[in-house]
Amino acid sequence: MTFKRREMLRIGMLGTGLSLPQYLRMHAAETPNAPKRSGIFIFLEGGPSHQDSFDLKPEAPIEIRGDFKPIATNVGGIEICEHMPQLASRADKYAIVRGITHNVPDHGLGKKYLLTGNKPSQTVSYPEYGSVVSHEYPSDSNLPTYVSIDESFVGPGYLGTQYSALTAAKPRHGVPYSVRGISLEEGLTVDRYKSQKKLLDDLDIAFKGFENLDDQVAGMDRFTEQAFDIISSPRTRAAFDLSQENPAESDRFGKHEFGQSLLLSARLIEAGVHFVTVRLRPAEFDFDTHSENFSRLRTLLPAFDRALSGLLDRLQERSLLSSTAIMAAGEFGRTPKINSNGGRDHWARAMCAVMAGGDVKGGQVIGATDATAAEPDSIGYKPDDLAASFFQNIGIESRTEFKTNVGRPITLLRDGSPIRDLF
C-alpha cells in the first residue's frame, strides 16, 4: 500500500493551487534580480463609471451627467468628482488617461484584456502583468516576486505556473494579518506549523522509500525547509502583518478591505516584492453599478479616494513613489445614459485609467471623450497602449519575445505603444 503524505498533512494551498514549498521549488533555479521599478496594479473590478469619477460631463443633459458635480483639483484646469476630494488635492501626483476604448464589454473577457494588455484569444493564454515581472525579474527566494491580493483571475498563461502569484487574502482592519492569511490553512498558526513540521520530518523518515516523489508533492525536501524559513522569517512575516502598523496610519488608508489592501501593497513594496496586484471582486466594492449607481458610488468613491491617496502619500514619504509604477483601472466604463434602475450598464467604447509613480508626469489629463463620454473625441487609446506604458514604466520592453509552453515564439504585447505624453 502506498501512503501519500499530502493526504496526511498539507501546507495550505495558494489561490493558484500551489503550496508554498511548490512555489519555492519552481523559483529555485532563478537568480535574484531587480526590475527598474516595482509595480502595483489596482484593478477596479466590475467596471467603474468613468463619467462619474474622472471624466465628468457637467454640461450634458441630466440623464447623462447624473447627480455628481466636478470639483477643482490642485492643478489648474483639471476637475474630478466631488466625492474624491483627497485625490483632488493630489492631482499633481498622478495622470488621468481618458478616451480609452475597446470592444469587449464582457466582465470575463474584459478582465483578461485589462489584466494582460492583450485582447483575449482562443488559442493563446496571455500572462498577467505580475507574472511577466516575475519571469523577467525573479526575486530572492526568501520573498515572493509577485503577490496578488485576492485570488489571481488570469494567471501566468503561457509563461507557466512557476510565475504564478503568491496569493494573499484580503486584509481586514483591526485583524492581525499573519502569514497564515497568505499561505497556510485557516487556523494554522506559525507555532502549530512548527509542530506539524516536526511531524513532517518524522513522516519523511518513516515513509522514505515507500513512494515515488514527484514535483507536486508538498511538504518535503529542502523546499519545505525554505517554506518554513519564509513562514517563520521575521522579515517576511512583518511585511504581511498589518497589526504592526500605527493605528493612525492604518486609518489613513481606510478601515475597509480596499484601504487595507493598498496599505498591504505598500508594505510589500517596501519589503522588496517586485509586483502587487490588488484585485477586489464584487462584494464590498462592486463597481458593476447596473442599478443605484449614484448611491453606491457615494460609498465606493470616497473609499477609493482615501485608499489611493494614502498609497501615494506613503510611497512618496518613504521615497518609493519614483521607483514604483502604479496603475488603476477597471475592465470597461459605463453607459452614457442612465438606465431605468438608476444605474449604468457595460460600456467598453470609453473608459479611463489613473497612472502614477516612476516616470509618469503627474498633474495632467491625456486623451478626451466626446460631449457625452461615449467615445474618444479623437483616435483614443487601447488597453494595449496602457499596458505598453505600464511595462515601460516598470522597465520591460513591450516587444520582448517569449516562448509559449510549446516552444512557439510570442511577443509580450501583440499591439499597442507607450503613450508618449505620460512620460
What role is predicted for each listed range?
Residues 1-423:
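Ligand-binding pockets and gating/stacking loops
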